Amino acid sequence: MSGPYIYADVDNLEGTQPVGNKQCAGLVQHYTNVGTTEYWTNGKKVRGNGLNVAKGTAVATFVSDAVEGKGYYANASHGNHAALYISQTDKGIMVMDQWAGDKNKPNVSSRLMRFLGQNRDGSYINPSNNGDALSVIMKSATSMRPK
């Protein structure tokens, strides 16, 4: 695996125009060399690792993320998310992100992804908005998507 992927000037993105396809993954792809989502896999969980996750690190939600390096990015129309890490508190994780088609978030901007926990089945509650669901993006040499 390779990574992490970091954009050190993340603070300067506040209020800028969306990039790429305007989807969340497009932001991290534009500002880092993380590549296509097909090869993304989960690195360390972000929550609780604030001292070990650099500002500007590309982070995302992953399916099957219980084991590091075994998860994959779903790349679905909803229920997954990618962003650039800023910081964290006991309430959640601050990220810089973009959303295609969200009239309330027309530009790249920072926001708090609150810690929302997991459902009984182990899936994350509202993963696109849940700081608990974020892991550092790493890149695999082979596709991580199920066949």
What does each model-identified segment do?
Residues 3-15, 86-147:
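Aromatic- and glycine-rich peptidoglycan recognition patches
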Residues 1-82, 87-88:
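Secreted/periplasmic proteins that engage bacterial cell-wall peptidoglycan
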